[in-house]
């Protein structure tokens, strides 16, 4: 009985370790970092003020945020 339990435990541990393999670079784990890069304002953004090099404080939005709240 104990050998069957040990074999079952070993198989379960091996299967778990195979599912815990790290993700490749092109899979979903890297997507939040890419979304953060998309929030950086550019001169093309309609709220971007070239004199302050950031967005207008009165018109803060999710896509143009560096001068907001700080």
UniProtKB/Swiss-Prot annotation:
Keyword Disulfide bond: yes
Tissue specificity note: Expressed by the venom duct.
Entry annotated with the keyword Iron-sulfur: no
A matching Pfam family: Conotoxin
Gene Ontology MF term list: ion channel inhibitor activity; toxin activity
Swiss-Prot/TrEMBL domain comment: The cysteine framework is III (CC-C-C-CC). Classified in the M-2 branch, since 2 residues stand between the fourth and the fifth cysteine residues.
The protein's name: Conotoxin TxMMSK-02
Organism: Conus textile
């Amino acid at each position: 009985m104990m050998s069957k339990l040990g074999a079952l435990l070993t198989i379960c541990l091996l299967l778990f370790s195979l599912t815990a393999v790290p993700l490749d670079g092109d899979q979903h784990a890297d997507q939040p970092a890419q979304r953060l890069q998309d929030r950086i304002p550019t001169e093309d953004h309609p709220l971007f003020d070239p004199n302050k090099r950031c967005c207008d404080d009165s018109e803060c939005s999710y896509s143009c945020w560096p001068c907001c709240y700080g």
